[in-house]
Amino acid sequence: MKLVWFVYESGSRGFKAIRKYLDKFIGFFTTDGYVVYKVYDNEEHPQQLRSSCLTHIRRYLVDALDEHRELIMWFIDEVGRMFAQEYESKKLGESSEERLKRRLKHTKPIMGRIKDKFESLARNKFSKLGVLTVRALKYMKNEW
């Protein structure tokens, strides 16, 4: 079942509003980097499996394009390769099991390359990178 659900309670998407709905949820859900979702990133909530929104990550990267075009385009292209795998899976009408196999075979290596590149930059303390580039990379790190 595919569902998009935005939770606002009394105009808030704060901790209480989110917990009211997601504590009973079983499965995967995708979020932005809003801190209240981080409660589901630990062993306390084994049935709620949070993943990060690649569109949000890509948006931060696009914001940094003018600072370090070649570097940022490398990350954007890698994210695009992940999107292409999802598109292909959808186009072929793959089952959940087939999609998982595709992700393990094709998407996992892409994520490995992204992580390696990111960690290399982090070891150098993001030296000589602009403010927006560092912001994009830190957002990505926090969502990893």
Label each residue range with its predicted role.
Residues 1-144:
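Catalytic center-proximal scaffold of phosphoryl-transfer enzymes
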